[in-house]
Amino acid sequence: MQFDYIIIGAGSAGNVLATRLTEDPNTTVLLLEAGGPDYRFDFRTQMPAALAFPLQGKRYNWAYETEPEPFMNNRRMECGRGKGLGGSSLINGMCYIRGNALDLDNWAQEPGLENWSYLDCLPYYRKAETRDVGENDYHGGDGPVSVITSKPGVNPLFEAMIEAGMQAGYPRTDDLNGYQQEGFGPMDRTVTPHGRRASTSRGYLDQAKSRPNLTIRTHAMTDHIIFDGKRAVGVEWLEGDSTIPTRAAANKEVLLCAGAIASPQILQRSGVGNAELLAEFDIPLVHELPGVGENLQDHLEMYLQYECKEPVSLYPALQWWNQPRIGAEWLFGGTGVGASNHFEAGGFIRSREEFAWPNIQYHFLPVAINYNGSNAVKEHGFQCHVGSMRSPSRGHVRIKSRDPHQHPGILFNYMSHEQDWQEFRDAIRITREIMHQPALDQYRGREISPGVECQTDEQLDEFVRNHAETAFHPCGTCKMGYDEMAVVDGEGRVHGLEGLRVVDASIMPQIITGNLNATTIMIGEKIADMIRGKEALPRSTAGYFVANGMTVRAKK
């Protein structure tokens, strides 16, 4: 089998590349996905309100686990990643947050990455998006990804929480992806107008999969990339339960889009990475790149949960006797409780003036429950998910064997810097202050978690050690740049090799301020133009907010 391009991973970026490259009818593409199809009849992945279900099983989730995290009381922590057409866009929380403009301007400070500034990237965010309330300088109107924004009147808790943030002195913003990210406001979400999850499989692959020049193989577990000297010339994979490898040749390039956990794994198994690690497993060295699998970053978050004094939370939706009606309303009408992920409000703040742009993110949820659906509080409640955005902690991903089915060693080194502890203490105390504003007086009951007895630095730190969880945003393990730990250049091309790119969240040099999916899709769009030799979209001229030393919040 021969193709112009072989794409490994049909996820948030891989599906973008498959769709854009096959727009040229003379270009042939093989798309390999280790998981299965995104079954449209499976409510677990298609119903926004069911977002916790895929994280509870292994059909759509790699369900990785970290090594014992040394600063988190040696907990082994969850590291869910999407498996199936759509990748993590098939199982994520559907929050469409691009990050802060200054995140990208910060990337562009690195020599060789100058064209990754916010204004260079904004046209690609817009190209990918169709927003339900119409296009403008910041939002697209005819892209493959359906984005809906929260409307007033969904649940009184959302407006009360935004109002409470303002009463605490923080700004309101009507668009967390627009001129000003900083502040509290409605959340954009990747949901279709018919109340279905808008994964990249639905948005991109649906328009491309019938093209004769695109071949899609599911249940295809990539073993390694085949090299001829320093040139990537093909891929070898295992299909289904078979132990006999299948091969295909790439006439032009191999495009690795397997995500921040699997992409470095595949490079290491293919002989690209730290020479000492590869020698441990008798893997012939193709090219030494010590940065492969290093620079691992994530967002850590925790929940502050409160009893709700009025019966306006989603607690009744968790009762089994209400779920058939909710399911029917969603299935036949695309409406009701099932048609939302219920992260309809959130915000970004600076906890201290020394941060040039927001370092704390909020997601508001009108029910008290863990992200993966466990430990639901058996009463009306609500919660804030809160976490720091740009932790200095760094971890790694390293293979444990040559077997592609064996999970790698993953260590995030969560909370390994004093800055981490300071940010989380600040975040808990600020959140409590917001929760005690007048706007929430009629709703706020007792604090369920952490509980009012948890007050000192030592008590807060212990709560974080025991209860903080991943926000499922790993990135950075094949970072873009030109220093000695960089893996790819500014076009995703692997240093020192030919015919091989990495295009996914692993190439982010530094994690962004917000959820990763929108930016991963943007990366796919931007590098697709580079691969095709197309001129980059014209740089945007839109303005954007820079705090520039402004006070963190208005004085009361």
Swiss-Prot record:
Q: Biological process GO terms, please?
A: glycine betaine biosynthetic process from choline
* InterPro entries, per database record: BetA (IPR011533), FAD/NAD-bd_sf (IPR036188), GMC_OxRdtase (IPR012132), GMC_OxRdtase_N (IPR000172), GMC_OxRtase_C (IPR007867)
- Write down the top EC class of this protein: oxidoreductase
Name of one Pfam family that matches = GMC_oxred_C
Write the Enzyme Commission number(s) for this entry: 1.1.99.1, 1.2.1.8
Molecular-function annotations in GO = betaine-aldehyde dehydrogenase (NAD+) activity; choline dehydrogenase activity; flavin adenine dinucleotide binding
Gene Ontology annotations for the cellular component aspect, listed alphabetically: membrane
The cofactor(s) it depends on are: FAD
Q: Can you tell me which residues form the catalytic site?
A: H473
What are the entry keywords? FAD, Flavoprotein, NAD, Oxidoreductase
Source species, domain of life: Bacteria
Say if the entry is tagged with keyword Glycoprotein: no
Pathway given in the UniProt record: Amine and polyamine biosynthesis; betaine biosynthesis via choline pathway; betaine aldehyde from choline (cytochrome c reductase route): step 1/1
PROSITE patterns found in the cross-reference section: GMC_OXRED_1 (PS00623), GMC_OXRED_2 (PS00624)
The entry marks the following residues as binding FAD, namely 4-33
What is this enzyme's catalytic activity, as reactions? Answer: choline + A = betaine aldehyde + AH2; betaine aldehyde + NAD(+) + H2O = glycine betaine + NADH + 2 H(+)
**What function is annotated for this protein?**
Involved in the biosynthesis of the osmoprotectant glycine betaine. Catalyzes the oxidation of choline to betaine aldehyde and betaine aldehyde to glycine betaine at the same rate.
Q: Which family does it belong to?
A: Belongs to the GMC oxidoreductase family.
NCBIfam families referenced in this protein's UniProt entry, alphabetically: betA, PRK02106.1
Which protein is depicted? Oxygen-dependent choline dehydrogenase
Query: What is the native source organism of this protein?
Result: Escherichia coli O6:K15:H31 (strain 536 / UPEC)
Q: Which gene encodes it?
A: betA
